[in-house]
């Protein structure tokens, strides 16, 4: 698999990390080298599997000005860890929450106020945006082709 831990990261992995910064920031892996924080145009916050889809698409397109940050603990919300992770990008980047679930499902409604509060405390004059599926009564489309099309649309919006 493309995303495996190395023996060197085993020490790091022995404890739970509430927020995981972009794997491309670790120079030891073979991921694309990201631009300096002042040149990053988007910070994508997410949780779960969508991260791996986004990372694979960014690598394929060789995009170096988008950073992904995974929030692994939704409650209690990891304000300190998130503050540390987003601070280098606060002045220059747009901040977006991405999820594959419909807007009325998933983590959006439980994390948006915490993330916005964190941005406000960093005195970032930006509003957190949402990219994901439209609100729906059902968590899934029921059709594999439609699901794949929607997933591609989400990824394309993130990478544009």
Where would I find each of the regions flagged by the language model?
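Single conserved hydrophobic/aromatic residue that forms the stacking wall/gate
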Residues: 1-8, 12
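A short, charged/proline- and glycine-enriched loop
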Residues: 36-42
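Short helix/loop capping segments that flank catalytic or ligand/cofactor-binding pockets
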Residues: 6, 28, 52-55, 77, ...
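A general structural motif
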Residues: 14-25, 45-51, 72-81
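Peripheral docking tails and interdomain loops at the edges
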Residues: 85-88, 99-160
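Secondary-structure transition/capping motifs at alpha-helix termini
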Residues: 38, 57-67, 88-93, 118-127
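Short glycine-rich or small-residue beta-strand-to-loop segments that form or flank ligand, phosphate
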Residues: 45, 94-102
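Generic long, charged, amphipathic alpha-helical segments
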Residues: 51, 56-89
């Amino acid at each position: 698999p493309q995303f495996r831990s190395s023996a060197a990261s085993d020490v790091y992995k022995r404890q739970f990390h509430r927020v995981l910064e972009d794997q491309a920031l670790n120079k030891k892996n073979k991921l694309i080298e990201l631009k300096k924080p002042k040149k990053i145009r988007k910070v994508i916050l997410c949780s779960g599997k969508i991260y791996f889809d986004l990372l694979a698409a960014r690598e394929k397109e060789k995009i170096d000005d988008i950073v992904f940050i995974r929030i692994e603990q939704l409650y209690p919300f990891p304000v300190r860890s998130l503050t540390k992770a987003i601070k280098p990008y606060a002045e220059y980047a747009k901040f977006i929450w991405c999820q594959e679930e419909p807007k009325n499902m998933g983590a959006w409604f439980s994390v948006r106020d915490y993330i916005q509060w964190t941005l406000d405390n960093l005195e970032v004059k930006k509003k957190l945006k949402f990219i994901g599926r439209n609100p729906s009564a059902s968590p899934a489309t029921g059709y594999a082709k439609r699901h794949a099309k929607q997933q591609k649309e989400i990824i394309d919006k993130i990478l544009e």
